[in-house]
Amino acid sequence: MPDISLSIPRRRLPRLRPLAAAVLGAVLLHGQAWAAQPVEKPQPVPAQAGNEPGLTQGLKETGNYTVTTAPAEPLHLDPPKLPDLSGYTAAAVEAKIVRKPGGRASVQRMVQQQPLKEFTGGSNRLAEWVKRQRQMPQAIFIEGGYVNLAQLAGKLPASALEQVEPGVFVARLPIVVSQGATLDIDKQVKELRLSQERGAFLVNDGMLFVRDSKVTGWSESKKEPAWFKTPNEFRPFLISWGGAEVYLSNSTFTSFGYNASKAYGISISQYSPGMDKQMKRPRPKGWVIDSTIVDSWYGFYCYEADDLVVKGNTYRDNIVYGIDPHDRSHRLIIADNTVHGTRKKHGIIVSREVNDSFIFNNRSYENKLSGIVLDRNSEGNLVAYNEVYRNHSDGITLYESGDNLLWGNQVLANRRHGIRVRNSVNIRLYENLAAGNQLIGVYGHIKDLTNTDRNIALDPFDTKVSLIVVGGKLAGNGSGPLSVDSPLSLELYRVAMLAPTKSSGISLPGVLGEKQDQILDLLVRQDKAVLIDPVESQAELQD
């Protein structure tokens, strides 16, 4: 077996953060005893007869796969260019506020109001508000221009909005920001409490600002936040619709959302397909920056929304997901967030054609399943420089999502795989560190999803997987550094495999194990790029 502790090419890796340095140090220390043992050095594998002189494509057939040297130059990539975040600030939010003309607030019925149809239409949802308000349901409507919530003190009935102590307001009806209106909730409002018992929530169809404040789903009977108990129990929420803009800055949102359509927590969503065709609104806009979101059903959700910014937030102890952009949302920036303690599923997930987006410099840890997930044909995304650790499943997971680049991530001490790729092609993994994960450092595989509850027409898939792995370190992962089952192709170059957990040394599971000697000889001893692919494709190459 090759001694891969020797002759590893020197190269520049991303700077290790303290946790990454500690984990890597521990696994390297664990591997020192193995590295010190004398091992039999392999003989170089000779080129196959019949190759043209000067080519580096000698075939080495093993089972149904071949190991081939590949040109390294096409594998070179410059570090990815990240979006400039300097413009997404509290001052930039302030500059977006237009304070004239002044607007007004009034109490009106909820029925026959476009922004509320999602909550008063099918599935007998109107009954929820009848039960809670004990009357034909009403809401507070902001109309006609700019309104600061603090200025409404004493101007509406206490059954609608009451200031219960200086700067602390309780809303006992839903608040609707109408098209053409602006609602500003600023530091004059120490806390806006949305009454759970009375069915209050926030709907934005105009411009909504929450700055230096606190908004809480509130149990009036218990005099505390409406802490999560069961999925279907109503809790207040915030939704911003197509054509509207929402800017949440330096604020805290607690105990939002439940298991009902568009009532998930903090949501930015185009109108439903039927209403969208009728209303023809542009896609919604918004930023969520430098804020804290706690105990929400979904910490953040979007649907058919473009160019949103989710930056510098803390998502803590949310229920299903921390950050969940969904269906056909594009060019998102998800950066500098800390996401931890998600109780049911993933920290950060983008799902169903969330394309051309940037997920970088986030920390996602101690979530119930994976730290970061790309799902259901989400393509063209960059996942870079994230620290993903101690999650209860994988670190980073890609399901049925091709053409994505993972660069410089530190994926550490997760309970399953470090980086897992399923049914996804043209996945490029550059300069990543996967260390101390309980199963495989990088795991690629295929799975037939036909006989599952998946809607194949809505979420098609191919049972194909292909990866390019360049640079980085795979160290001290419990079941091995790398495994790819049935790859369409796999390219490896400058990958350091360190600190095996088994006394026998580095072991590549699965089909890679059958040709481990050839792979490690080319990759480590000869410092060449290695291509592993099916015999059929190599036969096509020769033809």
From Swiss-Prot:
Q: Which SMART domains match?
A: CASH, PbH1
Example of a GO biological process term:
alginic acid biosynthetic process
Q: Which Pfam families match?
A: NosD
Q: Subcellular location, in the record's words?
A: Periplasm
User: Disulphide bridges in this chain?
Assistant: none
Which key words are in the record?
Answer: Alginate biosynthesis, Isomerase, Periplasm, Repeat, Signal
The family database entries (InterPro entries) matched by this protein are listed as: Carb-bd_sugar_hydrolysis-dom, Mannuronan_C5-epimerase, NosD_dom, Para_beta_helix_rpt-2, PbH1, Pectin_lyas_fold, Pectin_lyase_fold/virulence
Catalytic machinery residues: H326 (proton acceptor)
Q: Report the NCBIfam families cross-referenced here.
A: epimerase_AlgG, para_beta_helix
Recorded protein name is: Mannuronan C5-epimerase
Its lineage opens with: Bacteria, Pseudomonadati, Pseudomonadota, Gammaproteobacteria, Pseudomonadales
Tell me the gene name. algG
